[in-house]
Amino acid sequence: MDNKIVYVVSDSVGETADLVVRAAMGQFPFAPDIRRVPYVEDTGTLKEVISIAKSNQALICFTLVKPDMRQYLLTEAAKEGVEAYDIIGPLIDQIEEITGQVPRYEPGVVRRLDEEYFKKIEAIEFAVKYDDGRDARGILKADIVLIGISRTSKTPLSQYLAHNKRLKVANVPLVPEVDPPEELYQVAKEKCFGLKIIPDKLNHIRKERLKSLGLSDGATYANINRIQEEIDHFEEVISKINCQVIDVSNKAIEETANIIVNAVQNQKMF
């Protein structure tokens, strides 16, 4: 049995069946010849695999989620004297019996979930890398660009959009003494969102921030005149970009995020 052939049949990529077969075969001193047959959608393909397996005296291991396909393979393989092992079917049936829930019978679900997970991780890493204007190159790479003065929820909003919407978000702080990065004027305005807040609200937030750091709330950072100067600068920059502005004064992060997501969906950007 040095070259025992195993046909791995799947209605998706076949990674699950492949891994299970290799794990099982690893318990034996011979090297199997594993041949994967992915994306099987019809009984014609199954019939062909059974015929080939019979001529090669091979074993068929399969992950097919649709009951009719599973039953067809088991029945026809038995008629031809071919050993066929259902890797996932009995477990699906058992879970259905225990939970009373009807399965989706949808191929490739795990793979799609994995892809979504990695998209989320990528978006989170992007938000960290391009947080607070650390690298202006992120502006042109981002799905969303948040623009605002200090303490307008840019960072938590970036993280929320990454975690929950898998969007790559860069955020850019604006201060009167520093010219905005040129990339802000190069990126599509539809991707940009200015975050504004009423002066009194921001004044309170900044004072609380200073107190939490053990600093005097009389610092310039929390001075109402300084805040107004920053807001004026923000409005000047935003008018040049001509992007949508969201008043975050009394909005939760989730509410602001929904406004942004609805806007980009309406524009069919993603």
Curated annotation (Swiss-Prot):
InterPro entries: Kinase-pyrophosphorylase, PPDK_reg. Keywords: Kinase, Nucleotide-binding, Serine/threonine-protein kinase, Transferase. ADP binds at residues 148-155. Transmembrane segments: none annotated. GO terms for molecular function: ADP binding; ATP binding; phosphotransferase activity, phosphate group as acceptor; protein serine/threonine kinase activity. It is an enzyme of class 2 (transferase). It catalyses: N(tele)-phospho-L-histidyl/L-threonyl-[pyruvate, phosphate dikinase] + ADP = N(tele)-phospho-L-histidyl/O-phospho-L-threonyl-[pyruvate, phosphate dikinase] + AMP + H(+); N(tele)-phospho-L-histidyl/O-phospho-L-threonyl-[pyruvate, phosphate dikinase] + phosphate + H(+) = N(tele)-phospho-L-histidyl/L-threonyl-[pyruvate, phosphate dikinase] + diphosphate. It holds the Pfam family Kinase-PPPase. NCBIfam families: PRK05339.1 (NF003742). Belongs to the pyruvate, phosphate/water dikinase regulatory protein family. PDRP subfamily. This is Putative pyruvate, phosphate dikinase regulatory protein.
